[in-house]
Amino acid sequence: MDRTGIFAGDDPFAIAAGWLAEAEPQEPNDPNAIALATVDAAGLPNVRMVLLKEIEAEAFVFYTNYGSQKAVEIETSGKAAFVLHWKSLRRQIRVRGLVEREEGVQADAYYASRSLKSRLGAWASEQSRPLASRTSLLAEVARVTARFGTNPPRPAFWGGFRIRPLEIEFWADGAFRLHDRFRWRRNSLSDGWSIERLNP
């Protein structure tokens, strides 16, 4: 298989991390933005942009409110998919897999690294629920600010999700739409990867 250059390597997570590092100085903003897809109880899909915060040895990690629609749908199905696309590189990565919570010291550390206003905002926002007005949201921010001051703890309802892929596809633009695509697949998390080139 002619998997060379930007596609070379035996570790898909290392390839993904390398592509992200290459995109960071070139992409206009949020090179780590992913379009995260979930499905509701009726099987109707939802998709939204979130920020990918970590690429681990065997997983991709993002953070959110556990009461949000995305979190509820993830915990109902145990699955999610996302695409990471860079116009500057003309490349993308597609991921499908199983999801688990990250709510330990790793989530604490990421929460602590956020700006104070973002940490307070996590307390103030009942994400995805109806909101009477922006004024009421700002009033809640003021209330939690008075309660916690400059050291709000991580809320129990806020933390990470770790996506453990069963499938990762690397795509790069080619002339005349003759794109290069390589798909890594495994049947379970304990299996090794099989790799195949796909038609554009």
From Swiss-Prot:
One of its GO terms (biological process) is pyridoxine biosynthetic process. Signal peptide: none annotated. The keyword Transport does not apply. InterPro entries: Pyridox_Oxase, Pyridox_Oxase_CS, Pyridox_Oxase_N, Pyridoxamine_oxidase_dimer_C, Split_barrel_FMN-bd. Keywords: Flavoprotein, FMN, Oxidoreductase, Pyridoxine biosynthesis. FMN binds at residues 48-53, 63-64, 70, 92, 127-128, 171, 181. Pathway: Cofactor metabolism; pyridoxal 5'-phosphate salvage; pyridoxal 5'-phosphate from pyridoxamine 5'-phosphate: step 1/1; Cofactor metabolism; pyridoxal 5'-phosphate salvage; pyridoxal 5'-phosphate from pyridoxine 5'-phosphate: step 1/1. One of its GO terms (molecular function) is FMN binding. The keyword Cell wall biogenesis/degradation does not apply. Its cofactor is FMN. It holds the Pfam family PNPOx_N. Belongs to the pyridoxamine 5'-phosphate oxidase family. Homodimer. This is Pyridoxine/pyridoxamine 5'-phosphate oxidase. It comes from Cereibacter sphaeroides (strain ATCC 17029 / ATH 2.4.9) (Rhodobacter sphaeroides). The gene is pdxH.
